[in-house]
Curated annotation (Swiss-Prot):
Disulfide bonds: none
Gene label: DMAS1-A
Protein name: Deoxymugineic acid synthase 1-A
pH-dependence of activity, as noted: Optimum pH is 8-9.
Biological source species: Triticum aestivum
Lineage: Eukaryota, Viridiplantae, Streptophyta, Embryophyta, Tracheophyta
Binding site for substrate: 112
InterPro entries, sorted: AKR, AKR4A/B, Aldo/ket_reductase_CS, NADP_OxRdtase_dom, NADP_OxRdtase_dom_sf
Catalytic activity: 2'-deoxymugineate + NAD(+) = 3''-deamino-3''-oxonicotianamine + NADH + H(+); 2'-deoxymugineate + NADP(+) = 3''-deamino-3''-oxonicotianamine + NADPH + H(+)
Role summary: Catalyzes the reduction of a 3''-keto intermediate during the biosynthesis of 2'-deoxymugineic acid (DMA) from L-Met. Involved in the formation of phytosiderophores (MAs) belonging to the mugineic acid family and required to acquire iron.
Length: 314
């Protein structure tokens, strides 16, 4: 699975994530430059991550140095934050993202969560007063306008359930290209993957290794005994087994490491396949969602429970 391996729609199958705890512009810029040198071409960011500007700086520097021939050789994904998930704020939000990136377009623009907040509310913790009802139709019509204006080559969503996708598809004139969600061997998303495949929506996996080390992540994936046993028997790392498994599901995936050796390891999962028996063993791993999105739930807000946020799909 090289970094240049792409879906039928031209999206690289593997991308580098840039969500970090607190702004770290220079380390991000250096890491993205190093990743480009290693071979990554897809970079995943978001307004909420505050990493758009250093990614743009790294991309411009890579073009100047000849590491890539032009910006067109890179695939940039960014996301609409909840406080801009309002009809009249979507296009301006993307224009601000493009200013941050110093680019004329993004390759993919996603609705970050099916959640709306009052304009200006950016950082957790959130209160019930921060949330307002999510007008999916209005937000999506504005996303479609982003595409028509040429500001986003493709549009999609993140953290959408089957039910929410069904609702979106009932009125969308431009269907979502991608649904970016948590996918890993501990949260395999079989139902959602089957639904998306049937609707022509590409599933993109975030936290394929369980997001160990983040404020919401877990050791459950990397510490899974089945994965450790498969890795040992195949002479691979647990990370490589996880990424190979996601890849063999047909999903795109977003991995995050600023360490060059790990960057290379995360790309080095070609030349072997998991056996049917290994797939069977992985399928039997007890399932539990890691990123529950609890911060978007409030007894006085639009989503009063996790069941409502995920439409029972947890």
């Amino acid at each position: 699975m090289g970094a240049g391996d792409k879906t039928a729609a031209g999206m690289p199958r593997i991308g580098m994530g840039t969500a970090v705890q607190g702004p770290k512009p220079d380390p991000i810029r250096r890491a993205v430059l190093r990743a480009i040198e290693v071979g990554y071409r897809h970079f995943d960011t978001a307004a909420h991550y505050e990493t758009e500007a250093p990614i743009g700086e790294a991309a411009a520097e890579a073009v100047r140095s000849g590491a890539v021939a032009s910006r067109d050789d890179l695939f940039i994904t960014s996301k609409l934050w909840c406080s801009d998930a309002h009809r009249d704020r979507v296009v301006p939000a993307l224009r601000q993202t493009l200013r941050n990136l110093q680019m004329e377009y993004v390759d993919l623009y996603l609705v970050h969560w099916p959640v709306s907040m009052k304009p200006g509310r950016f950082k957790a913790p959130f209160t019930a007063e921060d949330f307002v009802p999510f007008d999916m139709r209005a937000v999506w019509e504005a996303m479609e306008e982003c595409h028509r204006l040429g500001l986003a080559k493709a549009i999609g969503v993140a953290n959408f359930s089957c039910k929410k996708l069904e609702t979106l598809l009932s009125f969308a004139t431009i269907p979502p290209t991608v649904n970016q969600v948590e996918v890993n061997p501990v949260w395999q998303q079989r139902k959602l993957r089957e639904f998306c495949r049937g609707k022509g929506i590409q599933l993109c996996a975030y936290s394929p290794l369980g997001a160990k080390g983040t404020h919401w992540g877990s050791d459950a994936v990397m510490d899974a005994g089945v994965l450790q046993e498969i890795a040992a028997s195949r002479g691979k790392s647990v990370a490589q087994v996880c990424l190979r498994w996601v890849y063999e599901q047909g999903d795109c995936l977003i991995v995050k490491s600023f360490d060059e050796a790990r960057m290379r390891e995360n790309l080095d999962v070609d030349g072997w396949e998991l056996t049917e028996e290994e797939h069977r063993r992985i399928a039997e791993i007890p399932q539990r969602k890691i990123n529950l999105g609890k911060r978007y739930v409030s007894e006085h807000g639009p989503y009063k429970s996790l069941e409502e946020l995920w439409d029972g799909e947890i």
